Amino acid sequence: MGAESIHALRDVTIQIDKGEYVAIMGPSGSGKSTLMNLIGCLDTPTRGEYYLNGKLVSTMNDDELAYIRNKEIGFVFQTFNLLPRATALHNVELPLIYNGTAAAERIRRARTALEMVGLADRTNHKPNELSGGQKQKVAIARALANNPSLILADEPTGNLDSKSGADIMALLSELNRAGNTIIVVTHEREVAHCTNRIIYLRDGKIEREERPVGLKA
């Protein structure tokens, strides 16, 4: 007998418009990570189509995908992924360094991003001099540095205490009100209910969608 094919996602159809604030929620094995990788252009579907800003992702070459990941998508990870020996400012500069932004301009943009997340007084601090919540704010500032069309946050409060987690979700809500499109991947109901729309996955399929109580459809 041949190997059985395993489908991480099956018949998933989602449209997320500019300016939306969406949570993707589900238990372990539901397909959240796979969907996040597809949305973030870290993987491509074996079947079906994914359009980002009207562009069909599967037709892009490696250089085009790298450009999209750098310029169009701001990633926020559960584990922060900061360089331990670099200052907050330098960590935020990284995506700008990769795309060749001139030094003076990237420093200006990195400082502006840190100001946006309330860390103007922490620009020269290294990660070991910051709290967990401050580290995640640096990660969010890094995601904002290129002014991306989409912020993709994977379990952004997973390594934080409840107060720091609430602060991060309040910051993401503020960024959404300023016009940023944000997708949060989470298994925490409290986090999902900070968004405007929740997409529930189970066994690789969309189980249902809902809007948190008190929000207009």
Enumerate the language-model features and the residues they cover.
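Conserved beta-strand-loop-alpha-helix hinge in the C-terminal portion
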Residues: 205-217
